[in-house]
Amino acid sequence: MSATAVPKAKRIPQWKIEEVEYLTTLFKSYPVFAIADLTGFPTNQLQKLRKKLSKKVLFRVSKNKLILRALRNAGIDTSKFEELLTGQNLLLFTHMNAFELSLLLDKYKAKTYYKPGEIAQQEIVIPEGNTGLSPGPILSTFSKLKIPTRIQGNSIVITRDTVVAKPGDTISEELASLLQRLDIALKEVKINIKAAYDHGIIILRDQLVLDLEEYKNMVMNAHLDALKIGSEIAWPVPEILELSLNKAFRQALALAAEAGYVTPDTAEYVFRAAIMKALALAAEVSKYAPDLGLEVPTIQPTTPPEKKEEEEKKEEEEEEAETVSEEELAEGLGALFG
């Protein structure tokens, strides 16, 4: 009677076990992490970026299955991450909030070569000058792309700047090869975050994109609205009281001028108001009694000096509101998830 064969359990490589343990520790240690797409990002540029941001962000490239296992081990729901973990990914661990991290990465872009079939992001110009390339089969590529050349010594010289592609054009094999031979790297790439995890909340890429101008305008308008309301109710804080007192002073002057209440401070405005009323009356009388020959001069009304001061104050407040930095906006939005 033969014994039933028992299949041997597949042995998991030690490096995978250690990697999962390390990632699990990172997921538990950092309140914020992001999963980013590494597709097309040059390795040498990634190393430079890793070094530049080493004090703020920890970079880690790992296998997608190992990332998922580590997430589960750390007690994090993987349902939304499973569909995102395709292709080559980069893990970013930080103590900044997710919005700060996104803004930080947006500042760093790298240049790489275009590949055949890709779409030109900008106008591509082959510059005039010595290419350093020896004459040979490549001359047919220059000819096909309508780039004027001449031979000087043992080098190909481009005789004038030539536009070989415009934004939206598809890059041909010949052009991609020539750009690489000429060391013209024009394609702009950056690390794109797929999703971020901030203190238990998953934030997808679209939600991390900030319209900074819109937020600045919102902050500025909210600040100005607060000043208006505060000055209306005379909220007892130094910044508001100054506006409220200016407003009350102007209203008091207007009331005194209307009531004819004369003091050293109001005399000018009382008399001016009286003169304006008299002139208005004279103008009206002259319509019905032109024989009187009344000549009514035009006098420009005087604005109390306090109004100018208030306008200057408002301009200062607007300038202060406009100085809100990207980091402050990111911190404020990040606080919603803290």
Curated annotation (Swiss-Prot):
Pfam families: Ribosomal_L10, RL10P_insert. GO terms for biological process: cytoplasmic translation; ribosomal large subunit assembly. Keywords: Ribonucleoprotein, Ribosomal protein, RNA-binding, rRNA-binding. GO terms for molecular function: large ribosomal subunit rRNA binding; structural constituent of ribosome. Residues 295-338 are annotated as: Disordered. Residues 312-330 have a biased composition (Acidic residues). InterPro entries: Ribosomal_protein_uL10 (IPR050323), Ribosomal_uL10 (IPR001790), Ribosomal_uL10-like_insert (IPR040637), Ribosomal_uL10-like_insert_sf (IPR043164), Ribosomal_uL10-like_sf (IPR043141), Ribosomal_uL10_arc (IPR022909). It comes from the Archaea. The keyword rRNA-binding applies. One of its GO terms (cellular component) is cytosolic large ribosomal subunit. NCBIfam families: PRK04019.1-1. Part of the 50S ribosomal subunit. Forms part of the ribosomal stalk which helps the ribosome interact with GTP-bound translation factors. Forms a heptameric L10(L12)2(L12)2(L12)2 complex, where L10 forms an elongated spine to which the L12 dimers bind in a sequential fashion. PANTHER family: 60S ACIDIC RIBOSOMAL PROTEIN P0, LARGE RIBOSOMAL SUBUNIT PROTEIN UL10. Belongs to the universal ribosomal protein uL10 family. Forms part of the ribosomal stalk, playing a central role in the interaction of the ribosome with GTP-bound translation factors. This is Large ribosomal subunit protein uL10. The gene is rpl10.
